Amino acid sequence: MREVISINVGQAGCQIGNACWELYSLEHGIKEDGHLEDGLSKPKGGEEGFSTFFHETGYGKFVPRAIYVDLEPNVIDEVRTGRFKELFHPEQLINGKEDAANNYARGHYTVGREIVDEVEERIRKMADQCDGLQGFLFTHSLGGGTGSGLGSLLLENLSYEYGKKSKLEFAVYPAPQLSTSVVEPYNTVLTTHTTLEHADCTFMVDNEAIYDICKRNLGISRPSFSNLNGLIAQVISSVTASLRFDGSLNVDLNEFQTNLVPYPRIHFPLVSYAPILSKKRATHESNSVSEITNACFEPGNQMVKCDPTKGKYMANCLLYRGDVVTRDVQRAVEQVKNKKTVQMVDWCPTGFKIGICYEPPSVIPSSELANVDRAVCMLSNTTAIADAWKRIDQKFDLMYAKRAFVHWYVGEGMEEGEFTEAREDLAALERDYIEVGADSYAEEF
């Protein structure tokens, strides 16, 4: 067995977690109360597959290997009373009494510290139920207080306690349209600095990019958080499908790092997904393998706003789902390689890693997304993602030059030096990306 424990931290993390588990349950044929759908003798995905994410109790019920943590009760109370209340064990849902007030320092140093022991104890219990735990999957936002502060504290502690286990993150990057607080740049820079050495691979999801996709591809004039989370869940499901169903690539978490991370700090792959279609448009589109493969290289299908044509690719994984044959994939990849827009770094072979999972993508009934026969999720490590760091660093600098809002952080026991230290670390990260994108032969002169 190769189990994965999902840890959802903060409001964004928990709400994305809800969307994911609703989709996972549907994909594996598990009902809202944790029992199998009628007519199934065991969950879809084969014994090895579903048990990475679900634990079977003695009563034939399937329980997600997941923990929800938030510093205030509202979001987790919604899980306790919502449609999936019987799916989760009450011990999996942990909340505090007062929130982090969008303050990294409250989540990391004061309020978060009070709850962290309880969370780790629950994680320990869950790890004991596993035969061969392979690692952790985090979902949290970088801009909120709990997601950034408590999220990074947990990652730090887990890396000491479970050093060899993989730690993958799905991190929500703040966006101007959906900004919930003015201090998001501070929280993002501080949490990235703290987690940089502890996370093995971080898939960033930029709210602005998702917002635009919902408007453009799905025709939603004013996308809500539940629309955004539904789309994010679809992407996370595609990334994890190879862990949950029989597939040939990325069958365990370590493989993500091996295939995508050339240097420990350069661990922020860009995620693209296609096709993203509304139910109205789906009947008019063919979605051949080459069409969806090409779509992954278009900025409109990326989960982070950046321009890959200005960057260079270091590694590429294409994860297909559904009705796909290898010959079509090879032909599609050849077409892509012949395009002048796709530039690889010169020190890395132009290899594309291909994974095919024959289980077609599912869509929850209330979703705006159309049901399709095949889909592809591309994970690419590209130097273009440094744009995202540049954007947030500039916003950080504007505020920090005036020391705006800093007293709220210092008041929670944080030292001001941590701001400059974190900012310097991110400046170094930007430089790292410039260096890996430089041609290797240029250094000889």
Curated annotation (Swiss-Prot):
Q: Could you tell me the EC number(s) of this protein?
A: 3.6.5.-
Task: Please provide the record's keywords in A-Z order.
Answer: Cytoplasm, Cytoskeleton, GTP-binding, Hydrolase, Magnesium, Metal-binding, Microtubule, Nucleotide-binding
| Single GO biological process annotation from the record | mitotic cell cycle
* Listed GO CC annotations: cytoplasm; microtubule; nucleus; spindle; tubulin complex
Q: Where is the active site?
A: 255
Report whether Metal-binding shows up as a keyword of the record: yes
Q: Where does Mg(2+) bind?
A: 72
Its biological purpose is as follows: Tubulin is the major constituent of microtubules, a cylinder consisting of laterally associated linear protofilaments composed of alpha- and beta-tubulin heterodimers. Microtubules grow by the addition of GTP-tubulin dimers to the microtubule end, where a stabilizing cap forms. Below the cap, tubulin dimers are in GDP-bound state, owing to GTPase activity of alpha-tubulin.
Record protein name field: Tubulin alpha-3 chain
**Organism from which the protein derives:** Saccharomyces cerevisiae (strain ATCC 204508 / S288c)
